[in-house]
Regions:
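Beta-sheet repeat architectures centered on beta-propellers
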Residues: 1-167
């Protein structure tokens, strides 16, 4: 977008792009800039936050095990019959380490017990709870969609956490 105007004559903001097209914003749920409708990649991502909220006196001393996510999302305004979003959880063992890594020596085994990072879960309109397996001191959260006709609003998700070890 190269130029914008908030016009009182029209109800939506108007922008011009580099292909000499006028784009009307905040109208509909898809990208209609061309004749071929495209989905809008919409997301919101948190910064890192401590998993063990009750660990106020010894902040960061305990690992937390997130075993359930209670999503709070609505799909008001969606134009498809089964809208969905993806919720991704990014665990961090220590500040400054990469997401999903640990500073412990790996267990030697013929099986791969590692969980992918991020852990992604599909959430639909009537998803009441999502069972997870996530361990760490901190985590970040991302909610996104990339499908045509999907509009969503994120509320306050809740997580069920158990204390899971100490450093």
């Amino acid at each position: 977008r190269s130029a914008w105007i908030q016009n009182n004559i029209q109800s939506n903001p108007v922008a011009a792009d580099y292909n000499n097209r006028l784009l009307y914003h905040e109208s509909g749920v898809d990208d209609n800039a061309t004749s071929n409708t495209q989905p809008i990649y919409a997301y919101i991502q948190s910064s890192d936050f401590g998993i063990m909220a009750s660990d106020q006196n010894n902040s960061g001393q305990h690992f937390g095990f997130v075993w359930r996510l209670l999503p709070d999302v609505n799909f008001n305004g969606s134009t498809v019959s089964n809208p969905q979003v993806t919720m991704a959880l990014y665990p961090r063992q220590n500040s400054g380490t990469a997401y999903g890594t640990t500073d412990l020596n790996p267990v030697v085994s013929s099986q791969n017990y590692a969980f992918p990072t991020p852990q992604e879960y599909t959430v639909q309109q009537f998803t009441g709870e999502v069972y997870t397996r996530l361990r760490g001191r901190q985590m970040a959260f991302k909610c996104y969609s990339d499908t045509i006709g999907t509009a969503w609003q994120l509320g306050t998700n809740r997580y069920d956490v158990k204390q899971d070890g100490r450093r």
